[in-house]
Curated annotation (Swiss-Prot):
Organism: Human papillomavirus 38
A GO molecular-function descriptor: zinc ion binding
Disulphide-bonded residues: none
Gene expressing this chain: E7
Entry protein name: Protein E7
Record's subcellular location: Host cytoplasm; Host nucleus
SUBUNIT field: Homodimer. Homooligomer. Interacts with host RB1; this interaction induces dissociation of RB1-E2F1 complex thereby disrupting RB1 activity. Interacts with host EP300; this interaction represses EP300 transcriptional activity. Interacts with protein E2; this interaction inhibits E7 oncogenic activity. Interacts with host TMEM173/STING; this interaction impairs the ability of TMEM173/STING to sense cytosolic DNA and promote the production of type I interferon (IFN-alpha and IFN-beta).
Amino acid sequence: MIGKQATLRDIVLEELVQPIDLHCHEELPDLPEDIEASVVEEEPAYTPYKIIVLCGGCEVRLKLYVWATDAGIRNLQDCLLGDVRLLCPTCREDIRNGGR
């Protein structure tokens, strides 16, 4: 190398590149034939949630307490933001007695 910086011509590889055998000849342990039976499914984790929504009739504030999984609470959220409306007891009675 001449100078302070190395050039491509100055770099000399000392080790030769050799292919490596990726087949290491390891043996896998015997697996059960029915893998599905041996796998134990974990029960999904339930979390308590407090949901505050407005009544679909009079718009009074309603509180709803639920235990739900992550997927379950998302499904409930989609329903409540979509076409499902909750009713308070007063509006329920009004509808039951022929009102609205």
